Amino acid sequence: MPTYTRLYSDKHGESHFEDVEIDLTLTEYAPPAPPLELSSTTLAKQFGFMQAPAGWSSDWHPSAARNTFFVLSGEWEVTASDGEIRSFPAGSVLRAQDTTGKGHSSRVISDSLAVMVQLED
């Protein structure tokens, strides 16, 4: 089953990573095309592209909004406030939901292009 990574804040303000399985259901999505597997949908507020060069890094910060990042090229490294570090190469999906608390830090390992989708509150 496919997964994505969720970054969230606990009740004490620490951020943590969680691997989330994506539930897919065989769906007649666009007949007469054959059925395909589809997940439930989430409302989105806006989306945009984000590009950063290798070596870019941030200080500790919470996510400005509930965002989902789809890494198209390059690689990001994100550190949760609990100390766990994860890499997000091209093809990765990160749902950043740590909008309160200590947040996380980020750095770009190799020149990166990502799509950022801001979710509805």
Regions found by a protein language model. Name each.
Residues 1-3, 63:
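Short, small/polar residue-rich loop motifs at catalytic or cofactor-binding pockets
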Residues 14-60, 112-121:
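A short glycine-rich, His/Asp/Glu-containing loop-to-beta-strand
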Residues 22-23, 51, 81-99:
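Short acidic-glycine-tyrosine-enriched beta hairpin
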Residues 28, 86, 102-108:
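Short, Lys/Arg- and Gly-enriched loop/turn segments at beta-strand edges
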Residues 55-58, 77, 93-95, 99-105:
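Histidine-centered metal-chelating micro-motifs
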Residues 57, 62, 68-89:
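A short beta-strand-loop-beta hairpin characteristic of the jelly-roll/cupin
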